[in-house]
């Protein structure tokens, strides 16, 4: 097994622990994955999220810094780092990161929501309201997209069932 394969296995073990809220064990496994593959951005991002769940903002920020260095186009890394900065009390850096996440992905509802919460916290109600409106809009768009995709899938399924029934009726 190669280092990357072993790192992937440790990553999967770490994520299994994360899912069941064993954040300490998750961090241990993800750290092993990072040791084996120091460019494993997703392992850094996931370990940072686990640190964030344990209220270890400093460690989380360090991991999200690594992700940003490895993948500067990761809107999620900026968003998560913004959450860590906010948790550490650095609202200015948090706002900068939420803004950067939204520059990278203008449809990133979670970043709008986080920024709205921060705006509300620092007394910028008008900006918070604008961001909540955007979250609402994006939610409606996502629901509509899901419904449309589901309708297309269902139409195709009904067509296939009809063809299958026709074949059965014709004795094929």
Regions found by a protein language model. Give the residues of each.
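Alpha-helical tetratricopeptide repeat
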Residues: 1-172
């Amino acid at each position: 097994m190669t280092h990357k394969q072993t790192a992937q296995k440790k990553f999967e073990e770490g994520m299994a622990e994360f899912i069941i809220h064993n954040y300490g064990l998750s961090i241990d496994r993800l750290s092993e994955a990072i040791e084996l593959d120091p460019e494993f951005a997703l392992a850094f991002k996931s370990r940072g999220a686990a640190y964030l769940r344990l209220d270890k903002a400093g460690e989380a920020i360090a991991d999200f810094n690594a992700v940003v260095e490895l993948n500067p186009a990761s809107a999620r890394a900026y968003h998560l780092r913004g959450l860590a900065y906010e948790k550490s009390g650095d609202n200015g850096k948090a706002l900068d990161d939420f803004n950067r996440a939204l520059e990278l992905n203008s449809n990133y509802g979670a970043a709008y929501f986080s920024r709205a919460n921060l705006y509300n916290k620092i007394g910028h109600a008008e900006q918070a309201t604008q961001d909540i409106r955007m979250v609402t809009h994006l939610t409606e768009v996502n629901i509509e997209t899901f419904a449309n995709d589901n309708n297309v899938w269902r139409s195709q399924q009904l067509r296939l069932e009809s063809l299958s029934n026709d074949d059965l009726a014709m004795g094929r």
